[in-house]
């Protein structure tokens, strides 16, 4: 344990591992080294290097389930909202949609909605955010205008949105400082677009430092789906996040690690019993 593996070689009898100050041999070798997420916990590209050494295809990696960072102008406008969370529907350019909470942070946007969509977002793309997924905003505004024409638009929106968010959007000129009866059709349509189709182009993500998973990795086509053994290299197995398998939030990535380990173990047990 806690020994660095310096090299791995294979011959007809199995594998030879050079460690710090010692050599270890084995018939079967299981790579369970994870991805690149959270390097502070010891993440490294070791598993990918082993796969490439033995001729297996490794797909490009990037951070997944990770917060977005924002371009400086937008970030400076929204930093005061750090800690504010709202229900949302967020849509990627490829059409993937998640309905989860969105969280404003000092660095950009986070929360389950953003973490989920980050795995489907590509640099340079926009995401569309609906901050009022449970409200037909046009109908709501028209009904409130008929019932309370002198009520301020700000207070009306605060029924469904956090007060801090409404106040900040008004300061930024996104919400007119008017009463409901003063809200004209053009401004109402612009407001509806702002709150239900807020298009944001992230500057990037927070990267592997805070990512919960790594996208990409050892190509699953290189491995047996039943045993996790490399098709080209008998006796070499890959399990867990080192593979190109990524799940949603909710324990799916843990389950993949456990399930792939179980499948591998069943094969090792069967081989040993022969």
Segments and roles (model prediction):
Residues 35-54, 245-273:
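A conserved FAD-binding loop/helix module that cradles the flavin
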Residues 1-3, 60-62, 240:
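Short loop/edge segments at beta-strand edges and connector loops
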Residues 5, 23-43, 51-52, 102-107, ...:
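Short hydrophobic core segments
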Residues 14-18, 25-28:
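Acidic, glycine-enriched active-site microenvironments
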Residues 56-60, 66-186:
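An anion/pyrophosphate-binding glycine-rich loop and adjacent beta-alpha core
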Residues 1-14:
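A conserved short coil-to-beta-strand element within the FAD-binding core of flavoproteins
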Residues 167-246:
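A glycine-rich dinucleotide-binding beta-alpha-beta segment and adjacent secondary-structure elements
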Residues 37-39, 67-68, 105, 109-112, ...:
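Glycine-rich phosphate/pyrophosphate-binding beta-alpha loops
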């Amino acid at each position: 344990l806690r020994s660095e593996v310096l090299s791995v070689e294979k011959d007809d009898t199995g594998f030879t591992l050079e460690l710090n100050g010692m050599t270890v041999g084995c018939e079967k070798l299981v790579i369970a080294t994870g991805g690149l997420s959270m390097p502070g916990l010891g993440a490294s590209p070791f598993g990918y290097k082993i796969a490439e050494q033995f001729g297996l295809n490794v797909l490009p990696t990037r951070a997944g389930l990770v917060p977005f960072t924002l371009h400086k102008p937008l970030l400076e406008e929204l930093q005061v909202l750090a800690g504010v969370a709202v229900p949302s529907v967020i849509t990627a350019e490829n059409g993937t949609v998640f309905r989860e909470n969105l969280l404003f942070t000092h660095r950009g946007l986070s929360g389950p909605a953003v973490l989920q969509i980050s795995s489907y977002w590509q640099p340079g793309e926009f995401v569309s955010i609906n901050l009022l997924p449970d409200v037909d905003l046009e109908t709501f505004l028209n009904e409130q205008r008929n019932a309370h024409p002198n009520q301020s638009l700000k207070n009306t929106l605060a029924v469904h949105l956090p007060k801090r968010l409404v106040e900040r959007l008004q300061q930024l000129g996104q919400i007119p400082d008017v009463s409901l009866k003063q809200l004209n059709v053009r401004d109402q349509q612009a407001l509806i677009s702002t709150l239900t189709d807020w298009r944001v182009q992230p500057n990037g993500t927070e990267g592997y430092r805070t990512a919960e998973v790594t996208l990409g990795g050892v190509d699953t086509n290189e491995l047996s789906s039943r045993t996790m053994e490399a098709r080209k290299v008998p006796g070499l197995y890959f399990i867990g996040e080192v593979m190109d398998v990524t799940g949603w939030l909710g324990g799916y990535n843990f389950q993949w690690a456990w399930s792939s380990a179980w499948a591998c173990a069943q094969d090792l047990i069967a081989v040993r019993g022969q």
